[in-house]
């Protein structure tokens, strides 16, 4: 596909085997014109949609933006799960007359985070990736071919269970909150 101007990952001999070219894509930091930043973004978007197992991002600006985007998605997911768990477990830990003051806001926060994640991140191809920090896993990648000393490495992970978890907990928190609000105003 070199005729289309796309650069693919380089197969590298390793102790554990050869990494296939379809497993790793490198967004190289090569400035060849005034639209280099748009070219980097386009390459990253193409790599995300092609679902490479590893994506190495050399350009610092795009790498940092992508890492922040992934971190915000992770934060929303964790907040939805933890706030939902707090909503559901607070009635077990606090007296009934006080539990609603913690459980209802926690349930609302869980639902808000799960909804925001569903609207903003669910259909983004970047949500299937996590930033890789494990040096042992990074050593298997062709990082020696890079010009940047601090690339961002994304690894594709299945997020079906993660989405099910935070959606289930958020819906359970919603059901609990709806029940408590009904009890408060029905009496």
From Swiss-Prot:
PANTHER family, per the entry: PROTEIN PM1, TRANSMEMBRANE PROTEIN 11, MITOCHONDRIAL
Any one Gene Ontology biological process term? mitochondrion organization
Q: Which residues cross the membrane?
A: 80-96, 103-119
Q: Which family does this protein fall into?
A: Belongs to the TMEM11 family.
Keyword line = Membrane, Mitochondrion, Mitochondrion inner membrane, Transmembrane, Transmembrane helix
Q: Tell me where it mainly resides.
A: mitochondrion
Question: Which species is this record about?
Answer: Danio rerio
The protein's matches in InterPro entries, at most eight in alphabetical order, are given as: TMEM11
Task: Give a short account of what the protein does.
Answer: Plays a role in mitochondrial morphogenesis.
Localization annotation: Mitochondrion inner membrane
Q: What is this protein called?
A: Transmembrane protein 11, mitochondrial
Membrane topology designation: Multi-pass membrane protein
Q: Does the keyword Mitochondrion apply?
A: yes
Q: Name one GO cellular component term.
A: mitochondrial outer membrane
Top-rank taxon, per record: Eukaryota
- Report which gene this protein is encoded by: tmem11
